[in-house]
Amino acid sequence: GGVGLALDRMNTIVDIDELNLQVTVEPGVITQVLQEAVAAKGLYYPPAPGSRGSCTIGGNLAENAGGPRAVKYGVTRDFVLNLEVVLPDGEVVWTGANTLKNATGYDLTRLIVGSEGTLGIITRAVLRLVPLPKETRLMLVPFRDERKACEAVAAVFRAGITPSALEFMERDAIDWTLRYVQGVSVSIADDTKAHLLVEVDGNHADVLMRDCETILGVMEQHDCQEVLFAETAAEKEGLWKLRRRVGEAVKSNSVYKEEDTVVPRHALPDLLAKVKEVGARYGFKSVCYGHAGDGNLHVNIIKGDLADTVWQHDLPKAIREIFTYTVSLGGTLSGEHGIGLVQRPYMDIAFSPVQLDLMRRIKNSFDPQGIMNPGKVLPYAPPGTLCQLELQIRP
């Protein structure tokens, strides 16, 4: 047995501090609700997963969520100043200070963010805000070649531009969305293999236009097709809907396994090629899309017509190959979705036994009884290592 905590009723925006550009919230606040509340005061909270209309700040903190704007602004952890946390023994502590700078002691705040509920329960958060950009420009860039599209990503940054979003969608990703999601429409040439969705933001329209011209030049150097510029708010929302609903289209209409690989952005073309090569050998198809600007590629592996026995036996081997290659490129297992239970068997690919044992020691110092999300994140310890916690929660 166990106790499940639902914090969705702790949904108060406690204070919006316009002078210090901070907001204090409870964990049950919906991310989009927070964004809209601070936007009404000319402020901006950039971290926004695709599920921002339903996900909560507490969940974002637990996973260190990212989203499309991470490429320019950073992930959730980069916007957290201070946390109120209930520890497993019932003690209530604040982890930091409501300041932009803090060089005092160990950084407990950054340790709690992304810990997936294994160290404590977040009951309040002080988050950093930035001024709301006054202008945005958005373009959808098609390519006949997936590798060219991926190579264009790093080239944009080399040209001196930092987009507020730079998203990748292979042809299958868009086809799934157009097939299964109502109210999404875009014209796609028969020979188009991939798209980049590129957004820039700022306060001066003339500067953004120059940025768009630079980006367009980069795209043309990588043999893009005709670029679609979103001229109105409705057109922008339509293009974003096309990107945001890919995951929903795949997950609602297939048996799938999603990976959240992330690599240095220059390695994105090689990672995509490896995913397709592994799929061809094992007999599965994949739908790939994600936050290309920061190298975060979502890989949805589709069961399709594979027999259940093949799917269950071969899928873990295929995933291990993909993860091993990802790490060899300088990447890691998850950019923003976390580890939980499902990815736990692959942690040995990213971390040495010494690193994993260090993490277990941290877990044990916070939660010696192993009551906080037992069994999550860390694989079971081998004999001879710090194992008190693992012995307590081993099935």
Listing of model-derived features with the role each one plays in the protein:
Residues G1-L5, Y180:
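Glycine-rich loop at the start of a catalytic domain that most often binds anionic cofactors/ligands
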Residues N11-E167, M372, Q388-P395:
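FAD-binding subdomain of flavoenzyme oxidoreductases
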Residues E18-L21, M139, L306-D308, L341-D348:
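Short beta-alpha connecting loops at secondary-structure transitions
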Residues P49-S51, F229-E231, P374-V377:
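Short coil/turn segments at secondary-structure boundaries
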Residues G117, V299, D367:
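Conserved, mostly hydrophobic/aromatic
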Residues L127-P131, R137-P142, K148-E321, Y325, ...:
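C-terminal substrate-recognition/cap domain of FAD-linked oxidoreductases
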Residues V327-I339, K363-N364, P368-M372:
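Alpha-helix capping/hinge segments and adjacent helical runs
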